[in-house]
């Protein structure tokens, strides 16, 4: 009788392990389905700054939007900022999604390809700046990388996401102003 009880305990234990493993598969599949759905049905941008990760206060978003709006009126260059929650994209697909967002939203004037998208994921600890072809003629990928490394990341390391974003934005604007003259 004790052998049957022992066997029954082992059997129930194995079934519970199977249930745990299948739950992980369901969760992984659900997350991937959600991510694919987000990518296929991107929300329309509601302003220059689209904070889907809730990194900025309303006042901070307003300030970023005003700076970008004033710069766009001055130069016709469009800059969009998007923060992306880690549930909406895997770390491996972050760069691809940021390019997809830039293209889908049509950041920049179509005839000038003069758009810039700053994509941020606090959850994945990633940032990507996508420059349109017209912007690439004004400043290089190396200059973009320097802005990320020197103006943005030092603030992000201190969890100062608004300050880092603002610093990077102002450096991009300053660089573009000097290059356009």
What are these regions (language model features)?
Residues 2-9, 18-117, 122-181:
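A structural boundary signal for the start of the first folded domain, especially the loop/turn
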